[in-house]
Protein backbone atom coordinates (compact mmCIF):
# COMPACT_ATOMS: atom_id res chain seq x y z
CA UNK A 1 0.00 0.00 0.00
CA UNK A 2 1.18 3.53 -0.81
CA UNK A 3 0.28 6.14 1.75
CA UNK A 4 0.38 9.84 1.00
CA UNK A 5 -0.01 12.90 3.21
CA UNK A 6 -2.33 15.71 2.09
CA UNK A 7 -2.34 19.07 3.91
CA UNK A 8 -4.03 22.46 3.69
CA UNK A 9 -1.50 25.14 2.89
CA UNK A 10 -1.79 28.89 2.56
CA UNK A 11 -0.80 30.35 -0.80
CA UNK A 12 0.95 33.60 0.06
CA UNK A 13 3.62 35.29 -2.03
CA UNK A 14 5.38 38.64 -2.25
CA UNK A 15 2.28 40.28 -3.72
CA UNK A 16 0.55 39.96 -0.35
CA UNK A 17 0.98 42.59 2.37
CA UNK A 18 0.83 41.83 6.08
CA UNK A 19 -1.77 43.58 8.25
CA UNK A 20 -1.59 43.41 12.03
CA UNK A 21 -4.68 43.49 14.21
CA UNK A 22 -5.82 43.01 17.77
CA UNK A 23 -6.14 39.23 18.20
CA UNK A 24 -5.08 38.16 14.73
CA UNK A 25 -3.13 39.14 11.62
CA UNK A 26 -3.70 38.48 7.94
CA UNK A 27 -2.26 38.81 4.45
CA UNK A 28 -4.04 40.74 1.73
CA UNK A 29 -3.55 41.30 -1.98
CA UNK A 30 -4.87 44.87 -1.79
CA UNK A 31 -5.55 47.67 0.65
CA UNK A 32 -7.61 50.84 0.68
CA UNK A 33 -8.10 53.81 2.96
CA UNK A 34 -10.96 53.63 5.41
CA UNK A 35 -12.21 56.95 4.00
CA UNK A 36 -11.43 59.22 1.09
CA UNK A 37 -11.12 62.98 1.51
CA UNK A 38 -14.16 64.94 0.37
CA UNK A 39 -14.22 68.41 -1.17
CA UNK A 40 -17.05 70.83 -0.33
CA UNK A 41 -19.19 72.17 -3.17
CA UNK A 42 -19.40 75.96 -3.31
CA UNK A 43 -22.74 77.59 -2.68
CA UNK A 44 -25.87 77.06 -0.61
CA UNK A 45 -27.64 73.90 0.47
CA UNK A 46 -29.91 72.73 3.28
CA UNK A 47 -29.84 69.93 5.84
CA UNK A 48 -33.53 69.09 5.48
CA UNK A 49 -35.77 69.86 2.50
CA UNK A 50 -38.89 69.93 4.67
CA UNK A 51 -37.67 72.53 7.17
CA UNK A 52 -36.39 75.46 5.13
CA UNK A 53 -37.95 78.52 3.53
CA UNK A 54 -36.68 81.26 1.25
CA UNK A 55 -37.46 84.96 0.86
CA UNK A 56 -36.75 86.45 -2.54
CA UNK A 57 -37.70 88.62 -5.51
CA UNK A 58 -37.95 88.21 -9.30
CA UNK A 59 -34.94 85.88 -9.38
CA UNK A 60 -36.89 83.30 -7.35
CA UNK A 61 -40.42 84.25 -8.50
CA UNK A 62 -42.11 81.39 -10.34
CA UNK A 63 -44.97 83.69 -11.39
CA UNK A 64 -42.62 85.95 -13.36
CA UNK A 65 -43.57 85.91 -17.05
CA UNK A 66 -39.95 85.20 -18.04
CA UNK A 67 -39.55 82.21 -15.68
CA UNK A 68 -37.44 80.04 -15.80
CA UNK A 69 -35.02 82.19 -17.83
CA UNK A 70 -35.39 85.00 -15.28
CA UNK A 71 -34.63 82.76 -12.31
CA UNK A 72 -31.41 81.85 -10.50
CA UNK A 73 -33.03 78.75 -8.96
CA UNK A 74 -34.83 75.66 -10.22
CA UNK A 75 -38.62 75.36 -10.31
CA UNK A 76 -38.43 73.01 -7.33
CA UNK A 77 -36.48 75.52 -5.26
CA UNK A 78 -38.64 78.44 -6.41
CA UNK A 79 -41.61 76.70 -4.78
CA UNK A 80 -39.84 77.08 -1.42
CA UNK A 81 -39.44 80.86 -1.77
CA UNK A 82 -41.84 83.61 -0.78
CA UNK A 83 -41.18 85.99 -3.65
CA UNK A 84 -42.63 88.71 -5.83
CA UNK A 85 -40.87 90.41 -8.71
CA UNK A 86 -39.72 93.89 -7.73
CA UNK A 87 -40.06 93.21 -4.02
CA UNK A 88 -37.72 93.22 -1.05
CA UNK A 89 -38.10 92.95 2.70
CA UNK A 90 -37.09 96.58 3.16
CA UNK A 91 -39.49 97.87 0.50
CA UNK A 92 -42.31 96.11 2.33
CA UNK A 93 -41.14 97.56 5.64
CA UNK A 94 -41.12 101.21 4.49
CA UNK A 95 -43.48 101.18 1.50
CA UNK A 96 -42.02 103.99 -0.62
CA UNK A 97 -44.45 105.32 -3.24
CA UNK A 98 -44.59 103.48 -6.55
CA UNK A 99 -42.70 100.41 -5.30
CA UNK A 100 -43.79 96.78 -4.91
CA UNK A 101 -45.41 96.06 -1.55
CA UNK A 102 -45.43 92.31 -0.77
CA UNK A 103 -46.52 90.55 2.41
CA UNK A 104 -43.43 88.53 3.32
CA UNK A 105 -44.18 85.77 5.82
CA UNK A 106 -43.33 82.12 6.38
CA UNK A 107 -41.84 79.49 8.68
CA UNK A 108 -38.71 77.36 8.54
CA UNK A 109 -35.82 76.24 10.71
CA UNK A 110 -33.41 77.31 7.96
CA UNK A 111 -34.11 80.61 6.21
CA UNK A 112 -32.49 81.61 2.92
CA UNK A 113 -32.61 85.29 1.98
CA UNK A 114 -32.01 86.16 -1.66
CA UNK A 115 -33.41 89.68 -1.95
CA UNK A 116 -32.45 93.30 -1.35
CA UNK A 117 -31.35 94.46 -4.78
CA UNK A 118 -34.64 96.27 -5.43
CA UNK A 119 -33.74 98.79 -2.72
CA UNK A 120 -30.30 99.93 -3.83
CA UNK A 121 -28.79 103.15 -5.20
CA UNK A 122 -30.30 102.31 -8.60
CA UNK A 123 -33.81 102.59 -7.10
CA UNK A 124 -33.12 106.30 -6.36
CA UNK A 125 -35.50 106.39 -3.39
CA UNK A 126 -35.40 109.88 -1.86
CA UNK A 127 -38.04 110.83 0.76
CA UNK A 128 -35.79 113.12 2.82
CA UNK A 129 -32.81 110.84 2.27
CA UNK A 130 -30.79 110.13 -0.86
CA UNK A 131 -28.53 107.36 0.48
CA UNK A 132 -30.32 104.62 2.41
CA UNK A 133 -27.45 102.10 2.45
CA UNK A 134 -26.59 102.50 6.14
CA UNK A 135 -30.26 102.08 7.09
CA UNK A 136 -30.51 99.05 4.81
CA UNK A 137 -27.42 97.54 6.45
CA UNK A 138 -28.91 97.96 9.92
CA UNK A 139 -32.26 96.61 8.72
CA UNK A 140 -30.78 93.48 7.09
CA UNK A 141 -28.58 92.83 10.12
CA UNK A 142 -31.58 92.87 12.47
CA UNK A 143 -33.65 90.71 10.11
CA UNK A 144 -30.91 88.04 9.98
CA UNK A 145 -30.35 88.17 13.74
CA UNK A 146 -34.04 87.74 14.63
CA UNK A 147 -34.64 85.18 11.88
CA UNK A 148 -31.86 83.02 13.31
CA UNK A 149 -33.77 82.85 16.61
CA UNK A 150 -37.25 82.24 15.19
CA UNK A 151 -39.18 79.55 13.39
CA UNK A 152 -41.73 81.94 11.86
CA UNK A 153 -41.63 85.57 10.76
CA UNK A 154 -44.15 87.89 9.13
CA UNK A 155 -44.57 91.46 7.99
CA UNK A 156 -47.23 93.22 10.07
CA UNK A 157 -48.53 95.72 7.54
CA UNK A 158 -51.12 97.52 9.68
CA UNK A 159 -50.44 98.40 13.33
CA UNK A 160 -53.31 99.56 15.51
CA UNK A 161 -52.83 103.24 16.33
CA UNK A 162 -54.40 106.30 17.94
CA UNK A 163 -53.46 109.71 16.54
CA UNK A 164 -54.53 113.27 17.48
CA UNK A 165 -57.83 114.30 15.95
CA UNK A 166 -56.30 117.38 14.35
CA UNK A 167 -53.59 115.38 12.54
CA UNK A 168 -53.77 115.08 8.76
CA UNK A 169 -51.90 112.57 6.61
CA UNK A 170 -49.01 114.50 5.14
CA UNK A 171 -47.10 114.40 1.88
CA UNK A 172 -43.65 115.61 0.86
CA UNK A 173 -42.47 117.22 -2.36
CA UNK A 174 -39.22 115.27 -2.42
CA UNK A 175 -41.10 111.97 -1.99
CA UNK A 176 -43.05 112.07 -5.27
CA UNK A 177 -45.59 114.34 -3.55
CA UNK A 178 -46.47 111.39 -1.36
CA UNK A 179 -44.73 109.70 1.55
CA UNK A 180 -43.65 106.36 2.93
CA UNK A 181 -46.29 103.95 4.20
CA UNK A 182 -44.06 103.43 7.23
CA UNK A 183 -43.51 105.70 9.00
CA UNK A 184 -46.58 107.71 8.07
CA UNK A 185 -46.29 111.49 8.15
CA UNK A 186 -49.01 113.33 10.05
CA UNK A 187 -49.15 117.15 9.99
CA UNK A 188 -51.36 119.95 11.29
CA UNK A 189 -51.96 120.91 7.68
CA UNK A 190 -50.67 120.00 4.23
CA UNK A 191 -47.13 121.37 3.75
CA UNK A 192 -46.97 123.11 7.15
CA UNK A 193 -44.99 126.33 7.33
CA UNK A 194 -41.69 126.47 9.22
CA UNK A 195 -43.18 129.38 11.20
CA UNK A 196 -45.95 127.33 12.81
CA UNK A 197 -45.53 126.53 16.48
CA UNK A 198 -48.45 124.84 18.24
CA UNK A 199 -48.67 121.98 20.74
CA UNK A 200 -46.78 118.73 20.85
CA UNK A 201 -48.33 115.60 19.35
CA UNK A 202 -49.14 112.52 21.42
CA UNK A 203 -50.02 109.32 19.59
CA UNK A 204 -50.13 105.59 20.37
CA UNK A 205 -49.45 102.37 18.48
CA UNK A 206 -49.76 98.73 19.53
CA UNK A 207 -47.45 95.85 18.63
CA UNK A 208 -49.63 92.71 18.58
CA UNK A 209 -48.91 89.34 20.17
CA UNK A 210 -50.27 87.69 17.03
CA UNK A 211 -50.74 88.65 13.39
CA UNK A 212 -53.06 86.25 11.59
CA UNK A 213 -51.68 82.80 12.38
CA UNK A 214 -48.23 84.16 13.24
CA UNK A 215 -47.19 84.49 16.87
CA UNK A 216 -45.23 87.62 17.74
CA UNK A 217 -42.76 87.54 20.62
CA UNK A 218 -40.59 90.33 19.23
CA UNK A 219 -41.06 93.04 16.61
CA UNK A 220 -38.58 94.87 14.43
CA UNK A 221 -39.74 98.50 14.34
CA UNK A 222 -38.32 101.45 12.42
CA UNK A 223 -37.97 104.45 14.73
CA UNK A 224 -37.76 107.37 12.28
CA UNK A 225 -37.13 111.04 12.99
CA UNK A 226 -35.75 114.12 11.27
CA UNK A 227 -32.24 115.46 11.77
CA UNK A 228 -31.94 119.26 11.57
CA UNK A 229 -28.73 121.23 11.27
CA UNK A 230 -30.03 123.99 13.56
CA UNK A 231 -33.04 125.11 15.53
CA UNK A 232 -33.66 127.87 13.00
CA UNK A 233 -33.95 125.36 10.17
CA UNK A 234 -36.58 123.45 12.15
CA UNK A 235 -38.67 126.50 13.11
CA UNK A 236 -37.95 130.02 11.93
CA UNK A 237 -39.85 131.48 14.86
CA UNK A 238 -37.67 129.48 17.24
CA UNK A 239 -40.57 128.64 19.52
CA UNK A 240 -39.28 125.19 20.42
CA UNK A 241 -36.71 122.52 19.72
CA UNK A 242 -37.39 119.46 17.59
CA UNK A 243 -38.12 116.12 19.20
CA UNK A 244 -39.65 112.79 18.14
CA UNK A 245 -39.50 110.16 20.90
CA UNK A 246 -41.02 106.68 21.41
CA UNK A 247 -41.88 105.52 24.95
CA UNK A 248 -42.88 102.08 26.21
CA UNK A 249 -45.87 101.52 28.50
CA UNK A 250 -43.70 102.31 31.55
CA UNK A 251 -42.67 105.70 30.19
CA UNK A 252 -39.14 104.60 29.28
CA UNK A 253 -37.58 106.10 26.16
CA UNK A 254 -36.91 103.34 23.61
CA UNK A 255 -36.13 105.38 20.49
CA UNK A 256 -36.09 108.70 18.70
CA UNK A 257 -34.28 112.04 18.95
CA UNK A 258 -34.75 114.94 21.34
CA UNK A 259 -32.97 118.19 20.43
CA UNK A 260 -34.05 119.63 23.74
CA UNK A 261 -31.22 117.62 25.27
CA UNK A 262 -29.17 116.66 22.19
CA UNK A 263 -27.37 119.24 20.04
CA UNK A 264 -28.17 119.93 16.40
CA UNK A 265 -25.60 118.91 13.81
CA UNK A 266 -24.33 122.47 13.32
CA UNK A 267 -24.04 122.02 9.57
CA UNK A 268 -25.18 124.65 7.09
CA UNK A 269 -27.96 122.72 5.37
CA UNK A 270 -31.51 124.02 5.21
CA UNK A 271 -33.33 120.70 4.58
CA UNK A 272 -33.77 117.99 7.23
CA UNK A 273 -32.63 114.40 6.71
CA UNK A 274 -34.71 111.47 7.88
CA UNK A 275 -32.97 108.84 10.01
CA UNK A 276 -34.49 105.46 10.89
CA UNK A 277 -33.12 103.31 13.71
CA UNK A 278 -34.09 99.65 14.03
CA UNK A 279 -35.66 98.73 17.37
CA UNK A 280 -36.38 95.24 18.68
CA UNK A 281 -39.52 95.67 20.79
CA UNK A 282 -41.82 93.32 22.65
CA UNK A 283 -45.57 93.33 22.01
CA UNK A 284 -47.43 96.09 23.84
CA UNK A 285 -48.71 99.65 23.68
CA UNK A 286 -46.22 102.41 22.89
CA UNK A 287 -46.57 106.18 22.77
CA UNK A 288 -45.01 108.68 20.39
CA UNK A 289 -44.44 112.31 21.38
CA UNK A 290 -43.28 114.87 18.86
CA UNK A 291 -42.79 118.60 18.65
CA UNK A 292 -45.42 120.71 16.82
CA UNK A 293 -46.12 120.67 13.08
CA UNK A 294 -45.72 116.97 12.29
CA UNK A 295 -45.43 113.43 13.60
CA UNK A 296 -43.68 110.37 12.14
CA UNK A 297 -45.83 107.39 13.12
CA UNK A 298 -44.74 103.70 13.01
CA UNK A 299 -47.29 101.83 10.91
CA UNK A 300 -45.55 98.51 10.23
CA UNK A 301 -43.20 95.96 11.77
CA UNK A 302 -41.70 92.56 11.19
CA UNK A 303 -42.89 90.02 13.73
CA UNK A 304 -40.85 87.04 15.00
CA UNK A 305 -41.98 84.14 17.20
CA UNK A 306 -38.50 83.61 18.78
CA UNK A 307 -39.31 79.90 19.26
CA UNK A 308 -36.13 78.20 18.12
CA UNK A 309 -32.63 78.86 16.95
CA UNK A 310 -32.12 78.18 13.29
CA UNK A 311 -29.86 78.70 10.30
CA UNK A 312 -29.67 81.79 8.12
CA UNK A 313 -28.14 81.94 4.65
CA UNK A 314 -27.82 85.37 3.02
CA UNK A 315 -27.25 85.44 -0.73
CA UNK A 316 -25.49 88.41 -2.27
CA UNK A 317 -28.06 90.43 -4.23
CA UNK A 318 -26.57 92.73 -6.89
CA UNK A 319 -27.48 94.13 -10.29
CA UNK A 320 -25.89 93.36 -13.62
CA UNK A 321 -24.02 95.90 -15.71
CA UNK A 322 -25.32 99.45 -15.90
CA UNK A 323 -27.02 99.53 -12.50
CA UNK A 324 -25.50 100.61 -9.21
CA UNK A 325 -25.70 98.14 -6.31
CA UNK A 326 -24.76 98.27 -2.65
CA UNK A 327 -23.13 95.70 -0.39
CA UNK A 328 -25.49 95.95 2.57
CA UNK A 329 -26.30 92.22 2.48
CA UNK A 330 -22.60 91.28 2.56
CA UNK A 331 -21.87 93.66 5.42
CA UNK A 332 -24.92 92.54 7.38
CA UNK A 333 -23.68 88.96 7.11
CA UNK A 334 -20.36 89.97 8.65
CA UNK A 335 -22.22 91.53 11.57
CA UNK A 336 -24.49 88.54 12.24
CA UNK A 337 -23.01 85.55 14.13
CA UNK A 338 -23.94 82.20 12.60
CA UNK A 339 -25.01 83.69 9.26
CA UNK A 340 -23.68 82.15 6.03
CA UNK A 341 -23.05 84.25 2.92
CA UNK A 342 -23.24 83.07 -0.68
CA UNK A 343 -21.16 85.47 -2.74
CA UNK A 344 -20.45 85.79 -6.45
CA UNK A 345 -16.93 85.81 -7.82
CA UNK A 346 -17.87 87.31 -11.20
CA UNK A 347 -20.13 90.15 -12.39
CA UNK A 348 -23.83 89.35 -12.73
CA UNK A 349 -24.62 88.33 -16.33
CA UNK A 350 -28.25 87.44 -16.94
CA UNK A 351 -29.90 85.21 -19.51
CA UNK A 352 -33.38 86.77 -19.65
CA UNK A 353 -31.83 90.25 -19.48
CA UNK A 354 -28.73 91.77 -17.90
CA UNK A 355 -30.16 91.31 -14.42
CA UNK A 356 -32.00 87.97 -14.44
CA UNK A 357 -30.72 84.42 -14.90
CA UNK A 358 -27.02 84.40 -14.02
CA UNK A 359 -25.27 81.06 -14.60
CA UNK A 360 -22.84 81.42 -11.69
CA UNK A 361 -25.70 82.14 -9.29
CA UNK A 362 -27.60 79.13 -10.62
CA UNK A 363 -24.62 76.93 -9.84
CA UNK A 364 -24.16 78.45 -6.38
CA UNK A 365 -27.84 77.91 -5.56
CA UNK A 366 -28.22 74.49 -7.19
CA UNK A 367 -27.43 72.84 -3.85
CA UNK A 368 -30.82 74.04 -2.56
CA UNK A 369 -32.31 71.18 -4.58
CA UNK A 370 -30.57 68.64 -2.34
CA UNK A 371 -30.07 67.69 1.28
CA UNK A 372 -26.51 68.03 2.54
CA UNK A 373 -24.85 66.30 5.47
CA UNK A 374 -22.93 69.50 6.22
CA UNK A 375 -23.33 73.14 5.26
CA UNK A 376 -20.66 75.72 5.98
CA UNK A 377 -19.20 79.00 4.82
CA UNK A 378 -16.78 76.91 2.73
CA UNK A 379 -19.63 75.11 0.96
CA UNK A 380 -21.73 71.99 1.42
CA UNK A 381 -20.95 68.29 1.62
CA UNK A 382 -23.23 65.30 1.09
CA UNK A 383 -20.62 62.52 1.11
CA UNK A 384 -20.32 60.36 4.22
CA UNK A 385 -16.57 60.64 4.70
CA UNK A 386 -15.59 62.26 8.01
CA UNK A 387 -12.54 63.98 6.51
CA UNK A 388 -11.84 66.84 4.16
CA UNK A 389 -8.52 68.17 2.93
CA UNK A 390 -9.13 71.77 3.98
CA UNK A 391 -10.59 73.15 7.20
CA UNK A 392 -14.25 74.12 6.64
CA UNK A 393 -14.79 77.74 7.57
CA UNK A 394 -17.45 78.48 10.18
CA UNK A 395 -20.30 78.78 10.62
CA UNK A 396 -21.04 75.16 9.84
CA UNK A 397 -23.91 72.89 10.69
CA UNK A 398 -24.72 69.20 10.37
CA UNK A 399 -22.29 66.29 10.20
CA UNK A 400 -19.27 68.21 9.04
CA UNK A 401 -16.00 66.50 8.09
CA UNK A 402 -12.78 67.37 9.85
CA UNK A 403 -9.57 68.44 8.17
CA UNK A 404 -7.01 65.64 7.75
CA UNK A 405 -4.07 64.67 5.57
CA UNK A 406 -4.69 61.77 3.22
CA UNK A 407 -1.65 59.83 4.41
CA UNK A 408 -2.91 59.93 8.01
CA UNK A 409 -6.10 57.98 7.25
CA UNK A 410 -5.67 54.28 8.21
CA UNK A 411 -5.77 51.63 5.47
CA UNK A 412 -7.75 48.39 5.66
CA UNK A 413 -6.98 45.12 3.83
CA UNK A 414 -8.93 44.31 0.69
CA UNK A 415 -8.98 41.78 -2.12
CA UNK A 416 -7.90 38.22 -1.31
CA UNK A 417 -7.43 37.82 2.46
CA UNK A 418 -5.48 35.01 4.14
CA UNK A 419 -5.03 34.55 7.93
CA UNK A 420 -1.40 34.41 9.08
CA UNK A 421 -2.00 31.69 11.69
CA UNK A 422 -1.29 28.09 10.70
CA UNK A 423 -3.93 25.39 10.54
CA UNK A 424 -3.14 24.42 14.13
CA UNK A 425 -5.08 27.49 15.22
CA UNK A 426 -8.18 26.23 13.43
CA UNK A 427 -8.48 22.83 15.01
CA UNK A 428 -10.31 23.86 18.15
CA UNK A 429 -13.42 26.00 18.07
CA UNK A 430 -12.97 29.04 20.39
CA UNK A 431 -14.72 28.43 23.69
CA UNK A 432 -15.95 32.03 24.05
CA UNK A 433 -17.21 34.22 21.28
CA UNK A 434 -14.56 36.57 19.93
CA UNK A 435 -15.32 40.31 20.08
CA UNK A 436 -16.54 41.02 16.57
CA UNK A 437 -18.16 43.47 14.23
CA UNK A 438 -21.64 42.91 15.68
CA UNK A 439 -20.43 44.30 18.99
CA UNK A 440 -19.03 47.36 17.24
CA UNK A 441 -22.34 47.97 15.46
CA UNK A 442 -24.25 48.14 18.73
CA UNK A 443 -22.35 50.92 20.44
CA UNK A 444 -21.71 54.62 20.00
CA UNK A 445 -18.03 55.37 20.21
CA UNK A 446 -17.46 58.90 21.49
CA UNK A 447 -14.65 60.88 19.94
CA UNK A 448 -12.53 63.12 22.12
CA UNK A 449 -8.94 63.87 22.99
CA UNK A 450 -7.44 60.72 24.49
CA UNK A 451 -4.17 61.46 26.16
CA UNK A 452 -2.37 58.13 26.28
CA UNK A 453 -2.56 54.37 26.63
CA UNK A 454 -5.56 53.83 24.42
CA UNK A 455 -4.19 50.77 22.69
CA UNK A 456 -3.55 49.02 25.97
CA UNK A 457 -7.21 49.12 26.82
CA UNK A 458 -8.03 46.74 23.97
CA UNK A 459 -5.24 44.20 23.96
CA UNK A 460 -6.98 41.96 26.48
CA UNK A 461 -5.71 38.43 27.05
CA UNK A 462 -5.15 35.69 24.52
CA UNK A 463 -7.01 32.39 24.77
CA UNK A 464 -5.28 29.14 23.98
CA UNK A 465 -8.49 27.96 22.33
CA UNK A 466 -8.12 30.08 19.22
CA UNK A 467 -6.45 33.28 20.37
CA UNK A 468 -7.66 36.84 19.92
CA UNK A 469 -9.38 39.40 22.08
CA UNK A 470 -12.23 38.03 24.15
CA UNK A 471 -15.56 39.78 24.13
CA UNK A 472 -15.29 40.43 27.86
CA UNK A 473 -11.84 42.04 27.74
CA UNK A 474 -12.76 44.18 24.74
CA UNK A 475 -15.97 45.35 26.38
CA UNK A 476 -14.03 46.38 29.47
CA UNK A 477 -11.56 48.23 27.26
CA UNK A 478 -14.31 50.11 25.46
CA UNK A 479 -16.02 50.91 28.75
CA UNK A 480 -12.80 52.41 30.11
CA UNK A 481 -12.27 54.43 26.94
CA UNK A 482 -15.85 55.67 27.05
CA UNK A 483 -15.60 56.75 30.67
CA UNK A 484 -12.27 58.52 30.13
CA UNK A 485 -13.57 60.28 27.04
CA UNK A 486 -16.75 61.41 28.79
CA UNK A 487 -14.76 62.85 31.69
CA UNK A 488 -12.33 64.58 29.35
CA UNK A 489 -15.12 65.86 27.14
CA UNK A 490 -17.02 67.28 30.10
CA UNK A 491 -13.92 68.97 31.46
CA UNK A 492 -13.10 70.36 28.02
CA UNK A 493 -16.58 71.80 27.57
CA UNK A 494 -16.46 73.50 30.98
CA UNK A 495 -13.07 74.97 30.15
CA UNK A 496 -14.35 76.19 26.79
CA UNK A 497 -17.34 77.90 28.39
CA UNK A 498 -15.11 79.70 30.87
CA UNK A 499 -12.71 80.68 28.13
CA UNK A 500 -15.55 81.97 25.96
CA UNK A 501 -16.60 84.31 28.75
CA UNK A 502 -13.10 85.74 28.83
CA UNK A 503 -12.59 86.14 25.10
CA UNK A 504 -16.13 86.80 23.88
CA UNK A 505 -14.97 90.20 22.67
CA UNK A 506 -12.15 88.70 20.65
CA UNK A 507 -13.56 87.00 17.54
CA UNK A 508 -10.14 85.98 16.24
CA UNK A 509 -9.32 84.26 19.53
CA UNK A 510 -12.58 82.33 19.31
CA UNK A 511 -11.83 81.27 15.74
CA UNK A 512 -8.34 80.15 16.76
CA UNK A 513 -9.74 78.16 19.66
CA UNK A 514 -12.34 76.52 17.43
CA UNK A 515 -9.63 75.50 14.98
CA UNK A 516 -7.51 74.01 17.75
CA UNK A 517 -10.47 71.99 19.03
CA UNK A 518 -11.27 70.69 15.55
CA UNK A 519 -7.65 69.72 14.95
CA UNK A 520 -7.65 67.83 18.25
CA UNK A 521 -10.88 66.08 17.31
CA UNK A 522 -9.48 65.14 13.92
CA UNK A 523 -6.38 63.63 15.54
CA UNK A 524 -8.52 61.79 18.08
CA UNK A 525 -10.82 60.44 15.38
CA UNK A 526 -7.88 59.23 13.33
CA UNK A 527 -6.56 57.50 16.43
CA UNK A 528 -9.89 55.80 17.07
CA UNK A 529 -10.09 54.70 13.44
CA UNK A 530 -6.68 53.11 13.85
CA UNK A 531 -8.04 51.10 16.78
CA UNK A 532 -11.14 50.10 14.84
CA UNK A 533 -8.98 49.08 11.90
CA UNK A 534 -6.91 46.84 14.16
CA UNK A 535 -10.07 45.30 15.60
CA UNK A 536 -11.42 44.65 12.11
CA UNK A 537 -8.21 43.00 10.98
CA UNK A 538 -8.18 40.76 14.04
CA UNK A 539 -11.86 39.95 13.67
CA UNK A 540 -11.48 39.07 9.98
CA UNK A 541 -8.45 36.90 10.72
CA UNK A 542 -10.36 34.97 13.36
CA UNK A 543 -13.33 34.58 11.03
CA UNK A 544 -11.10 33.18 8.31
CA UNK A 545 -9.50 30.77 10.77
CA UNK A 546 -12.95 29.53 11.76
CA UNK A 547 -13.72 28.92 8.08
CA UNK A 548 -10.53 26.87 7.84
CA UNK A 549 -11.63 24.86 10.86
CA UNK A 550 -15.01 24.22 9.21
CA UNK A 551 -13.24 23.13 6.02
CA UNK A 552 -10.98 20.73 7.94
CA UNK A 553 -13.96 19.28 9.81
CA UNK A 554 -15.88 18.76 6.55
CA UNK A 555 -12.89 16.97 4.98
CA UNK A 556 -12.58 14.65 8.00
CA UNK A 557 -16.32 13.87 7.90
CA UNK A 558 -16.29 13.15 4.13
CA UNK A 559 -13.18 10.96 4.39
CA UNK A 560 -14.58 8.68 7.09
CA UNK A 561 -12.16 5.74 7.46
CA UNK A 562 -10.44 6.50 4.16
CA UNK A 563 -8.24 9.27 5.60
CA UNK A 564 -6.67 9.68 9.02
CA UNK A 565 -6.04 13.18 10.42
CA UNK A 566 -2.47 13.04 11.66
CA UNK A 567 -2.01 16.74 12.50
CA UNK A 568 -4.08 19.91 12.25
CA UNK A 569 -5.02 20.32 8.57
CA UNK A 570 -3.15 17.16 7.44
CA UNK A 571 -4.47 13.69 6.54
CA UNK A 572 -2.83 10.39 5.56
CA UNK A 573 -4.58 8.31 2.90
CA UNK A 574 -3.90 4.93 1.25
CA UNK A 575 -3.48 5.66 -2.45
CA UNK A 576 -4.45 2.10 -3.39
CA UNK A 577 -7.71 2.22 -1.46
CA UNK A 578 -8.70 5.82 -2.35
CA UNK A 579 -7.91 6.62 -5.97
CA UNK A 580 -7.88 10.02 -7.67
CA UNK A 581 -11.66 10.28 -8.00
CA UNK A 582 -12.01 9.37 -4.32
CA UNK A 583 -9.51 12.03 -3.37
CA UNK A 584 -11.30 14.58 -5.52
CA UNK A 585 -14.51 13.78 -3.66
CA UNK A 586 -12.87 14.18 -0.24
CA UNK A 587 -10.54 17.09 -0.75
CA UNK A 588 -11.87 18.99 -3.77
CA UNK A 589 -15.56 18.20 -3.24
CA UNK A 590 -15.82 17.30 -6.94
CA UNK A 591 -14.78 20.90 -7.74
CA UNK A 592 -17.69 22.34 -5.72
CA UNK A 593 -17.59 24.63 -2.68
CA UNK A 594 -19.37 22.79 0.16
CA UNK A 595 -18.16 25.11 2.93
CA UNK A 596 -19.49 28.66 2.63
CA UNK A 597 -16.93 31.36 3.15
CA UNK A 598 -17.59 33.90 5.89
CA UNK A 599 -20.00 36.62 4.76
CA UNK A 600 -18.64 40.06 3.81
CA UNK A 601 -18.11 42.22 6.86
CA UNK A 602 -19.95 45.53 6.95
CA UNK A 603 -17.66 48.26 8.20
CA UNK A 604 -19.08 51.61 7.16
CA UNK A 605 -18.34 54.28 9.74
CA UNK A 606 -20.89 57.03 10.30
CA UNK A 607 -20.29 60.21 12.29
CA UNK A 608 -23.00 61.37 14.66
CA UNK A 609 -22.87 65.10 15.47
CA UNK A 610 -24.55 67.95 17.28
CA UNK A 611 -25.17 70.66 14.64
CA UNK A 612 -24.90 73.48 17.17
CA UNK A 613 -21.75 72.31 19.00
CA UNK A 614 -18.93 74.04 17.13
CA UNK A 615 -20.36 72.47 13.99
CA UNK A 616 -18.09 69.44 14.33
CA UNK A 617 -18.39 65.81 15.29
CA UNK A 618 -19.04 64.48 18.75
CA UNK A 619 -19.53 60.79 18.21
CA UNK A 620 -18.70 57.76 16.14
CA UNK A 621 -20.88 54.78 15.28
CA UNK A 622 -20.28 51.71 13.16
CA UNK A 623 -23.15 50.94 10.79
CA UNK A 624 -23.40 49.18 7.40
CA UNK A 625 -20.55 48.63 4.99
CA UNK A 626 -17.68 49.34 2.95
CA UNK A 627 -17.81 45.69 1.95
CA UNK A 628 -14.52 43.98 2.66
CA UNK A 629 -14.68 42.08 -0.58
CA UNK A 630 -13.33 38.60 -1.27
CA UNK A 631 -13.03 37.33 2.26
CA UNK A 632 -12.46 33.86 0.86
CA UNK A 633 -10.40 30.79 1.40
CA UNK A 634 -9.61 30.32 -2.26
CA UNK A 635 -6.02 31.03 -1.33
CA UNK A 636 -5.88 27.68 0.49
CA UNK A 637 -4.27 24.98 -1.62
CA UNK A 638 -3.86 21.25 -1.13
CA UNK A 639 -0.23 20.19 -0.75
CA UNK A 640 0.69 16.53 -1.29
CA UNK A 641 3.63 14.81 0.34
CA UNK A 642 4.61 11.16 0.15
Swiss-Prot record:
Residues of this chain annotated as glycosylated in UniProt: 13, 48, 131, 382
Protein's UniProt name: Hemagglutinin-esterase-fusion glycoprotein
Topology, Cytoplasmic side: 639-642
Sequence segments annotated as region (Esterase domain-2): 298-352
Top enzyme class: hydrolase
Enzyme Commission identifier(s): 3.1.1.53
Coarse class of the protein's main subcellular location: virion
GO cellular component annotations of the record: host cell plasma membrane; membrane; viral envelope; virion membrane
Amino acid sequence: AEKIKICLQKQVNSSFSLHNGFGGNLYATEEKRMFELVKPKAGASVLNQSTWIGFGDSRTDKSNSAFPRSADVSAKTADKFRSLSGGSLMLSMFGPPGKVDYLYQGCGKHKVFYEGVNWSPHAAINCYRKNWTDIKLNFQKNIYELASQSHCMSLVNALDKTIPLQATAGVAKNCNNSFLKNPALYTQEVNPSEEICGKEYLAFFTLPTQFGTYECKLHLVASCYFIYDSKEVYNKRGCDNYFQVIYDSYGKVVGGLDNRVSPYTGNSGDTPTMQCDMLQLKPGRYSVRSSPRFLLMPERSYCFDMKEKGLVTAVQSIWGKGRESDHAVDQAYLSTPGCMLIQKQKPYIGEADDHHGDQEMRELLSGLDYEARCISQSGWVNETSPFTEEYLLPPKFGRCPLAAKEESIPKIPDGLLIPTSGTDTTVTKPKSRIFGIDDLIIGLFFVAIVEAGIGGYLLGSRKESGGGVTKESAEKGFEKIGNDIQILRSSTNIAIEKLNDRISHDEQAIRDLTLEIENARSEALLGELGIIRALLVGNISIGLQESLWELASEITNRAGDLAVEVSPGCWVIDNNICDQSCQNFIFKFNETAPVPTIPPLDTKIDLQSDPFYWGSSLGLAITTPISLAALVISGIAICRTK
